[in-house]
C-alpha cells in the first residue's frame, strides 16, 4: 500500500473516532459494568464546563428570549439517562469501641512468657511480601517476646521481604512453579481439590513423583532477611508419610504426601503469620476442612485471627446489592472461623481507599464508603473488632494524597512499602492501645 493510501486510511479512522467522541457521551454502562473513553473535548484539551455553570448559562438564555405567543412547541426529545443507583444508609453504633471484642486475645498475652501465642493475618494482595504483617509482628514480639516470621508455604511464588525462599529438586535450584504440585483454595478451579484439605494457609504442596517428577525429594532453603525474622526452632506441618530433617535455614523433605506449611518460630512469645491470598474476596474459608482448621487453631494456641478483605470486590461492582451480598458471604466466613477457633478473638480490617479514573480525574470508587460501613456493622453484630483502614487514611480521596506523598502506587489501589508500614503501624498501635485500656 502506498504512503498516500496509508495516510488516507489513518485519517478516515481518526475522523470516524472523532465523530463517535462527539456523538457518544464518553462511557457506556451495562448493569454494574462501565466502559469509558475520552471525549473529543478531553482529547483537544477543551475545558469542561461544570453542571452548575451549564444551568446558569441556560437560565440566562431563557431570560433573554421573548415570551411565547401561543407557539406550539415540538415534543422534547427523550434522553435515556444512566440510572442512578441509590446507596442505602447504614446505621452503625459508633458509641462502642470494638476493641472490647479483643479481650480474650489481650488475656492470652499474659501467658506469652511461658507459652506460644499465635496470631494469623489473612488478607488479599495488600499484605503480600509480609506488608503490614511485619509491623504487627515486630511490635508484638518487641513487647511480649517471640521470634521468627512464622508460617511459610513450601513454594513461595510471591517473594517476601522478610524471608528469602529457594527450592532445590533433582540437585538443582528450581522456580516455585516447577516444584511439587500446588493446590490453593483461592486459586482457579484447576488448582483446587475436592477434599478441602488445604491446611491453615489455604494452600498445600503435594510431593508425588507421579504428579511432578522428582518431587519426592525436596530441599527448602528459607533465609531470614533481617534480624527481626531470626528464629530458634522449625515446625513442619505435613502428612506423617513425609519425612524431614532440618539443618540451619534448610529443610530436607522426602516421601509422598502433603506439605501444608513450614514455620520459623520460637517456643514462647508471640508468633505472627502472614497469609496473603491474591485476588481473594475472603469468602473461601468454608471450603477448608473444619477439622484441619480447628486442630491447628487449638494446638497452636491461635488467640487472634486478622481478616483483611473486601478490596477485590470494589473495582468490579457498582451495585449496592452486590456489595451487600459479598459482606453477607464474609459474615459466613467469620462465623465459620469462630466455630473453628471459639477461644480466639477476630479482627477485621476493612479495605483502604481506592481510586478510579472518571473523565480524566482520580476519584474514590463509589462503593467503598458503603462497604466500609456494612463491614463495620457486620463486625459489631458478630462481636468482632473492626479497624477502618478507609477512615484511618482520611476517607474518600485520601489515596490521592497518599500517592502524592509516595505512600501509594500509581494504580491508586495498592500501598507502596512505606504506605504499608504506615498502615501496619497504625493497626498495631490501635491494638496495643486497646490492651492498655483493658489494664
Which residues make up each language-model segment?
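Short, Lys/Arg-rich N-terminal segment immediately upstream of the first membrane anchor
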Residues: 1-4
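Hydrophobic membrane-insertion alpha-helices, especially the h-region
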Residues: 7-25
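Catalytic His-Asp segment of secreted/periplasmic serine-dependent ester chemistry enzymes
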Residues: 26, 290, 352-439
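Juxtamembrane proline-rich low-complexity "stalk" or linker regions positioned immediately after a signal peptide
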Residues: 27-80
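Long, contiguous interaction/targeting segments characteristic
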Residues: 65-83, 91, 95-162, 416-418
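Conserved, compact domain cores that house catalytic/ligand-binding motifs in diverse enzymes
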Residues: 115-121, 128, 132, 269-362, ...
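Short beta-strand/turn micro-motifs composed of small residues
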Residues: 123, 222-224, 350
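Conserved SGNH/GDSL esterase-like catalytic core that processes O-acyl groups on lipids
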Residues: 128-328, 414
Amino acid at each position: 500500500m502506498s504512503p498516500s493510501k496509508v495516510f488516507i486510511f489513518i485519517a478516515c479512522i481518526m475522523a470516524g473516532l472523532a465523530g463517535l467522541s462527539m456523538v457518544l457521551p464518553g462511557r457506556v454502562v451495562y448493569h454494574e459494568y462501565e466502559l469509558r473513553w475520552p471525549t473529543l473535548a478531553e482529547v483537544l484539551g477543551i475545558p469542561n464546563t461544570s453542571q452548575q455553570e451549564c444551568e446558569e448559562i441556560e437560565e440566562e438564555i431563557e431570560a433573554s428570549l421573548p415570551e411565547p405567543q401561543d407557539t406550539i412547541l415540538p415534543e422534547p426529545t427523550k434522553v435515556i439517562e444512566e440510572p442512578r443507583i441509590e446507596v442505602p444508609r447504614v446505621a452503625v453504633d459508633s458509641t462502642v469501641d470494638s476493641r472490647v471484642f479483643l479481650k480474650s486475645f489481650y488475656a492470652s498475652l499474659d501467658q506469652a512468657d511461658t507459652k506460644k501465642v499465635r496470631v494469623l493475618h489473612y488478607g488479599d494482595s495488600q499484605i503480600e511480601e509480609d506488608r503490614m504483617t511485619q509491623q504487627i509482628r515486630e511490635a508484638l514480639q518487641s513487647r511480649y517476646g517471640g521470634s521468627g516470621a512464622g508460617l511459610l508455604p513450601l513454594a513461595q511464588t510471591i517473594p517476601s521481604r522478610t524471608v528469602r525462599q529457594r527450592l532445590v529438586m533433582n540437585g538443582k535450584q528450581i522456580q516455585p512453579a516447577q516444584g511439587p504440585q500446588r493446590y490453593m483454595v483461592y486459586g482457579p478451579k484447576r488448582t483446587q481439590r475436592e477434599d478441602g484439605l488445604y491446611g491453615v494457609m489455604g494452600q498445600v504442596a503435594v510431593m508425588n513423583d507421579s504428579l511432578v517428577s522428582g518431587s519426592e525429594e525436596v530441599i527448602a532453603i528459607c533465609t531470614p532477611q533481617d534480624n527481626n525474622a531470626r528464629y530458634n526452632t522449625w515446625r513442619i506441618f505435613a502428612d506423617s508419610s513425609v519425612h524431614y530433617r532440618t539443618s540451619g535455614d534448610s529443610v530436607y523433605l522426602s516421601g509422598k504426601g502433603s506439605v501444608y506449611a513450614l514455620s520459623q518460630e520460637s517456643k514462647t512469645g508471640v508468633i505472627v503469620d502472614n497469609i496473603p491470598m491474591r485476588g481473594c474476596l475472603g469468602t473461601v474459608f468454608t471450603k477448608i476442612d473444619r477439622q484441619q482448621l480447628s486442630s491447628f487453631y487449638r494446638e497452636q494456641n491461635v488467640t487472634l485471627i486478622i481478616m483483611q478483605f473486601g478490596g477485590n470486590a470494589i473495582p468490579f461492582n457498582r451495585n449496592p446489592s452486590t456489595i451487600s451480598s459479598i459482606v453477607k458471604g464474609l459474615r459466613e466466613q467469620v462465623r465459620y472461623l469462630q466455630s473453628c477457633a471459639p477461644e480466639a478473638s477476630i479482627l477485621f480490617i476493612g479495605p483502604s481507599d481506592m481510586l478510579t479514573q472518571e473523565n480524566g480525574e482520580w476519584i474514590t470508587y463509589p462503593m467503598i464508603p458503603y462497604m466500609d460501613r456494612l463491614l463495620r456493622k457486620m463486625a459489631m453484630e458478630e462481636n468482632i473488632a473492626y479497624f477502618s483502614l478507609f477512615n484511618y487514611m482520611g476517607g474518600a480521596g485520601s489515596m490521592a494524597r497518599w500517592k502524592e506523598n509516595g505512600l501509594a502506587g500509581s494504580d491508586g489501589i495498592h500501598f507502596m512499602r512505606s504506605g504499608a508500614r504506615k498502615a501496619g503501624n497504625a493497626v498495631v498501635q490501635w491494638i496495643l492501645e486497646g490492651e492498655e485500656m483493658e489494664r
